[in-house]
């Protein structure tokens, strides 16, 4: 996982080889830095990343994260992965829901039935099974629960509100009128 994180290209989103674009604003990098420094000061291991060049934050992996750390239950909104050990599936569910936020989550498993049962209990607006936590599809409603938002964007309602319908027809050849 760490080796893969080190290979992820960060940069200009107009470059097709870029995987991670810039943080939303340069000042947010200080916020992310504070989360990482807090975690390391409280015992987390920084396995990779933790640096940025302007608004381009390197993929960061922290291990041995605990509930005492900001990255545990606050939205960092950066390419930061927090790794912590859990005892079993019940403990994993408790940890996943132990936050006042709930935008998106992932369940990784080979057992899809278990994943679906787990997903139903997750307190998140979006749950992705065997995929990353962010997958944007304009036809699907995007939004969180708890303090991660109110309502949804995208989906049918979003498409209806943000588009204009236009009917265009093409008649190839002469139309045969009944008169």
Label each PLM-derived region with a short phrase.
Residues 45-50:
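Diglycine-centered glycine-rich loop/turn motifs
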């Amino acid at each position: 996982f760490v080796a893969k994180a080190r290979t992820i290209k960060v940069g200009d989103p107009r470059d097709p080889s870029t995987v991670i674009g810039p943080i939303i604003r340069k000042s947010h990098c200080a916020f992310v830095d504070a989360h990482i420094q807090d975690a390391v000061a409280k015992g987390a291991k920084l396995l990779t990343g933790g640096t940025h060049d302007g608004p381009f934050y390197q993929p960061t992996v922290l291990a041995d994260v605990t509930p005492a750390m900001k990255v545990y239950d606050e939205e960092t909104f950066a390419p930061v992965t927090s790794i912590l050990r859990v005892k079993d599936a019940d403990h994993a569910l408790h940890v996943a829901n132990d936050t006042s936020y709930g935008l998106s989550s992932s369940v990784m498993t080979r057992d899809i039935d278990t994943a679906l049962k787990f997903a139903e209990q997750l307190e998140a607006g979006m749950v992705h099974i065997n995929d990353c936590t962010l997958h944007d599809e304009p036809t699907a409603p995007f939004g969180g629960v708890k303090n991660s938002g109110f309502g949804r964007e995208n989906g049918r309602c979003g498409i209806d509100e943000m588009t204009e319908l236009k009917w265009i027809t093409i008649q190839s050849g002469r139309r045969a009128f009944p008169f």
